[in-house]
Amino acid sequence: MIYEICANSYESAKNAEAAGATRIELCSELGVGGITPSYGLIKKVMDELSIGNCVLIRPRSGDFTYSEEEFDVMLRDIVLCRELGCQGVVTGVLLHDNTIDVERTAKLKEAAGTMEFIYHRAFDCTPDPIVAIKTLKKLGVDRILSSGGKKSAIEGLPLLKELQRIGNGKPMIMPGGGINAESIVQIKAAGFVPSKVAVRMVTCIPCGITHCP
């Protein structure tokens, strides 16, 4: 089982490493669902810790439809993460109808280079998750974080299992949302090897999903 922890500070990243977590999703401002952490925080974690570090790329709170200027910031942040040697980036971009923004997602993935490219729970806002996973599969996304469209991954297990079947490991489906020591047993029983464990859950995005992106 792979354990990933949302870390919103150097201290929480250090604690996650000490507790034996496999990797972290580094972000700031969990109170609004997480936004891109500062360059200084990313560099300190990369310089001083050995835990795998996937960085959230989200320029602001709110929805996942971004202006040209916001998108440019996202591209620049991804390049910085690549230059610092981060394991991956966690991001997501939607069109105004909440479908996957194919063109921009492709550009973000290209900017990521050889880093892992993880599509976050913006996925759970899409109107048709089956179409969405097929789209992301064509784009070569490595992982998708999802609660199966529900407030918790346990509630969303039926859809998560179907997504896992369609993805067939590429992209890998990572259950996220409301996961704790008890629910991990159910997640494993459903056939999922990796599972995202977020230390705090918040509600921030328009579709009302309780999450850490």
Which residues make up each language-model segment?
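N-terminal pre-domain/capping segments
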Residues: M1-I24, E29-T36
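Active-site mouth loops of central-metabolism enzymes
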Residues: M1-S9, I57-L75, L94, F117-P129
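Hydrophobic faces of well-ordered beta-strands that scaffold small-molecule active sites
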Residues: Y3-A7, I24-L26, N53-I57, V89-T91, ...
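Catalytic cores of alpha/beta
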Residues: E11-A19, T65-I78, D124-L139, L160-G169, ...
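Residues at the C-terminal ends
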Residues: A18, D47-E48, E83, E110, ...
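Glycine-rich phosphate-binding active-site loops on the catalytic face of alpha/beta enzymes
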Residues: T22-I35, L80-H96, V141-E155, A190-P213
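Alpha-helix-loop-beta-strand connector modules within alpha/beta enzyme cores
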Residues: G34-S61, I100-A122, E155-A181, P213
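Hydrophobic, well-structured mid-protein blocks that either form specific transmembrane helices
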Residues: G85-G140
